[in-house]
Amino acid sequence: MTKFIFVTGGVVSSIGKGIVAASLGRLLKSRGYSVSILKLDPYINIDPGTMSPFQHGEVFVTQDGAETDLDLGHYERFTDTSMSRLNCVTTGSIYQAVINKERRGDYNGGTVQVIPHITNEIKERILRVAKSTNPSVVITEIGGTVGDIESLPFLEAIRQFRKEVGRQHVLYMHVTLVPWIASAGEMKTKPTQHSVKELRSIGIQPDILVCRSDRPLPKGLKQKLSGFCDVPEECVITSQDAKSIYEVPLNLEREGMAEQVLNLLQMEQRQPDLTQWQTLVQRLHTPKHELEIAIVGKYVQLSDAYLSVVEALNHAAISTYGKLRLRWVNSEDLENESAETHLGGVDGVVVPGGFGVRGVDGKIAAIKYARDRQIPFLGLCLGMQCSVIEWARNIGGLTDANSAEFDPHTTNPVINLLPGQQEVVDLGGTMRLGLYPCRVLPDTLAFKLYQEDVIYERHRHRYEFNNAYRDLLLKSGYAISGTSPDGQLVEIVELPKHPFFLACQFHPEFQSRPSSPHPLFKGFIQAAIALSLSTSTTPTPLEVS
C-alpha cells in the first residue's frame, strides 16, 4: 500500500518545506522507491496562472498543461519525475469543486460545510495522486505556516487522514526554525516548541522535526527538543543552511532522515545510491571556468520569477564545470540607458518569458546588443518573439514591426495571436499549455544540440510567429530551425552566422534536470564559456553544416 508523508511548516514562511519535501523524495528514490509529491496551497486562486510574478514567483507548467506552484519545479528536478495537474491543489480549486457538486445536487440537499465536505474533497485529492501512478510514497507539502487561518482545512484533513488509512501508513513531518540569537550566544528552541504546541492543538503530533538553522544542532539541544515536543531524539533532524539547494539531500542523508522515515512507516531499509548526486555537488564545488550571464527581464526584482531559468543555467554550468554569476538586468532600464552600460562584459544574454508591453523595448535592445556584439543569446517564449521583432525592424526593413500583443493596430504584426485565441475572454488556463511536439530541422544549431528529429517541450503562450512574414525574414538571413509537426507554428529560430543565437517559443527550462541539463542551456553555456576564455573580441561561430 502507498505510504503518505505530510510536511508542515512552522514559525516563519519560506522556511524551505518544498526543498525538504523534494530532498526526501530524492533520498527515497535513491533507495528504489517511487515517489510523487503533492502541494496543497491555501490561497483562493484556482491556480497561480493569473497571479503576479512579483507576488508568487514563476508559474511552473507541467506536461499536461497545468499552471502550478514553483515548488513543483523543485519536486521534478530533485526526483527526476514529471508531475501533473493532480500534484497542485489550491483552496480555490477545492471550493470550486465542492460548489460545483452542490450545484449539481450531489449532496442531496444537505448543508455544505468545511467539515466534512471541504476536508473530504482534500482527502480525495491526496488519494487521487496515489491512485494515478501507484507510487510507493506520496509526499504532501502543506503550504503556509501552522497557525494561519487559511491552512486549517488542510490540517484538519490530514489529521483525519491517518485514522482513515491507518497509522502505520502515515507520517507527519514538521519543518521549523531554530534561530541563533547573537546577543545571547545560543540557539533558541522556544519558537519550535510553540509551533509544535500549535500543531498538537489541531490534533497532529509530528513524528519527525526538521530544524532549519544556520549551524548544526548540538546533541543537548536535540535532547531538549525531543523532550518538549515528544519526538524521539533520532527524529530531530538538522537542516543547516547550505550554499546550494543541491547540497540539502546529502545533508539530510547524513542526518539519517530517510532511515527514520522508513522505520516509522515500516518500510524495508535499502542501501541508497547517491553517486550521481554526489558527483553533481562535487562538480558544483570544483569549477574550472567562471562566466557571467545577464538575465534581462521584467520581474528581476524577485528572482523566483525566473526560478526554473536560473536552475537550468545552473545545471548546464555545473555539467561543464562552470561557476555561474548572474547579472540581473531590468529591461525597463535599457529603454532609457545604453545596453553597454548594463550588459558590457557579460558572456551571455538570456531574455526569458513574460507578458505585456512594459519593458519590451528594453528586451529588444538587449537582443540587438547580443546580436551585434556576437554575444551568446538564448531567448525563451517572449524572448523569441522579441528576437523576431528586433530582426524584422533592424534587418528585415520593417521599422514598425511589432507584436499584436503590444500594439493591436500595428501594420506589421510579425507576432500574432494563435489560431483560436481571438475569441478567448478568460485569462486563466486558456493559453497553449503543456507538452507539444516540435520537428527539428536538419543542418541547424538546434539539431546539433538536440540530436533528434522530433522533440517535446512545454509551452505557455497565446501569441506566435506570424507566417505571413516567414519568407521575408528567411530571405534576410533569419533561420527557422524548429516547427510544429505540420510546419505551421514556428517553434525555434536562430542565426547561423552567430556564435550562438537561438530562441524558442517554448519553455525548455521546465525540462532541465540536475543530472541531465537541457541541451539548449548546455549549448548556450558552452558558447558563453568559449567567449569568456577567448582572447579575441569576436569569437568564432559554432560550425553548423
Curated annotation (Swiss-Prot):
Q: Enumerate the residues binding CTP.
A: S13, D148, I149, E150, K188, T189, K190, P191, T192, Q193, K224
Task: For this UniProt record, give its keywords in alphabetical order, as a comma-separated list.
Answer: ATP-binding, Glutamine amidotransferase, Ligase, Magnesium, Metal-binding, Nucleotide-binding, Pyrimidine biosynthesis
Gene3D superfamilies given in the database record: 3.40.50.880, P-loop containing nucleotide triphosphate hydrolases
Q: Where are the catalytic residues? A: C381 (nucleophile), H507, E509
In short, the EC number is 6.3.4.2
Q: Which PANTHER family match?
A: CTP SYNTHASE (PTHR11550), CTP SYNTHASE-RELATED (PTHR11550:SF0)
Protein known as: CTP synthase
Protein source organism: Nostoc punctiforme (strain ATCC 29133 / PCC 73102)
